[in-house]
């Protein structure tokens, strides 16, 4: 009989739902395993075939671990705040909450159609007030500890959108969405002091088993570097420009100073003669985002302020310039330029005719920048020293002369935590008329987002919440008037702690019970896309460390193992996108081929961490394999749906003993190490051998069903029932292997004549030389060749070969 995937999949999905098959067990006698997917943003497009790749991998692990006797926590939820829902609401006049709920319903239907073993009793949604009550609570704790603060920050302001956009959303001075002009504008923003955790965020990467590439990206993003901070006095002003440098050895090569255009000293030190040029330059760059400004490939621009600084090591006058390649937010907002030995400084100096002063031997800076190592030259008391020795001598000199000190600097900036948007968590802060600020009292949390479909930009730069005056204005018991914070939190907020709420999702009194957190943390396996390597994974580690410091969580790190699945590309090898028309909808695949086929195919495409193109042919191949499995187990020439093949017998003639035990060992190890494609290859080897065997022992038939169940759960549940079992396969014991069965009793030996291969034969292991020699001579292909020749010599090596020398 043919396999009807639609009927079987519907049957077992209904069974799992009605029996709550995947409800998390919390048996104290069992070990715990927490398998976590990065929860999705429920977009209007629904699921695409890229989502199930990571979800299938965690599901395989979760299903295997249940069968191995673990308590398994395998939850799913929704990262549901965010810009697309708000944009949709602006465009259509509909409520983003309704739109979001509709999308969640679609996602949930699609996810369930793929047979994932989630415990839906633990579902979380970042837009649910019962959830974001605790997001707000964490913010308040950070505020109390001085880690949440307000600052005037230069942001990318889009008057047309009526909001601030992130650096990543600005392209050539315009917004990515809609192409509206962007201006740099200082605005009051909430910041989180992630820099206070910079060292721990680097050092504690040693505690986790993550891909080295992700660890490196985080280390580089934090950008810890050791150097010196040097003070340059401004000529004719009572002011100093502080500069951080990792190359204190090149102090004698400084030929000018460059400040960020936003540096606080620019207005004070610019001379009347240069004011027009400086003002024109400031106007020119106001559309540029930080990303564009620091693009190494772009042409260097700048303006001379007319002022000079004094080099503290030799008293030389250094012209002070401004240029947009220096950012006010990085380091001190000013750099000392050593154009002979730094590519950006060299380009700038060449463009504006500034002097080049070589201080490292070798190279010709007039022709090209010289960055190779050498010894110090033109550097007074540093001459003849190598780089490190010169740094080690210069820093104490700077300290002694009170013009500098040793300093550790970080590329990491504090986290800009506010958005001028409606569809986000309200920040639980009240600004009072007397100039003070307070948090919303804890017993009044959550501070709920007022539901409205009238979401339009305020026009002032504030979020649309500024329009909702009933919500906005408050009065305390003493009659003091106040105004709620109108900024909302960024989409990163809820995702920075959601994995904790899954552990205790209904707790009204705590973010989560500490003993439960102790039972389940750290997360054993976290799977998601590599695009989150820095932002999400850095933010979540920062929040976790803060919660550890205040005694809310028991571990220093949230996730023990991290795995980044690759990307599924369109069949034209490009990223799937609606605009390219190459998006594959999983609903279509499930309808035509079945969920088990989709799961099997996505795990068999290649290594889980590789980016691979979608192939209809590969999908058909996966279905073909499942059909072969089905035919092996079922009686073909009957219409009855539960007729087991007569090939499946109680007796075991050991024909499949070795390959079965090899398969159990290999599949178990490959599942553990996420090598699912290799595991599937071994399952295919077993099925091929089972077809060739005379009978299929029930013991192995049942064992194989257990091995394939985590990948193809619907078909395997059906076969398990056909094998006579009343209960679901979800909690039956995982197969074990017999190590003795892996030892080969037979080996392949080759027979040669005069070094040329004549035959390959299978013989008993450790067959003695004399017997091997006799077998070789008796072999018809060998005998035919030596019939009319004299055998001069026979070389027999047990378990390997027999070579007969004859002429």
Swiss-Prot record:
Its main location: cytoplasm. A motif ('KMSKS' region) lies at residues 575-579. It catalyses: tRNA(Leu) + L-leucine + ATP = L-leucyl-tRNA(Leu) + AMP + diphosphate. InterPro entries: aa-tRNA-synth_I_CS (IPR001412), aa-tRNA-synth_Ia (IPR002300), Leu-tRNA-ligase (IPR002302), Leu_tRNA-synth_edit (IPR025709), M/V/L/I-tRNA-synth_anticd-bd (IPR013155), Methionyl/Leucyl_tRNA_Synth (IPR015413), Rossmann-like_a/b/a_fold (IPR014729), tRNAsynth_Ia_anticodon-bd (IPR009080). A motif ('HIGH' region) lies at residues 40-51. GO terms for biological process: leucyl-tRNA aminoacylation. Belongs to the class-I aminoacyl-tRNA synthetase family. This is Leucine--tRNA ligase. The lineage of its organism: Bacteria, Bacillati, Bacillota, Bacilli, Lactobacillales.
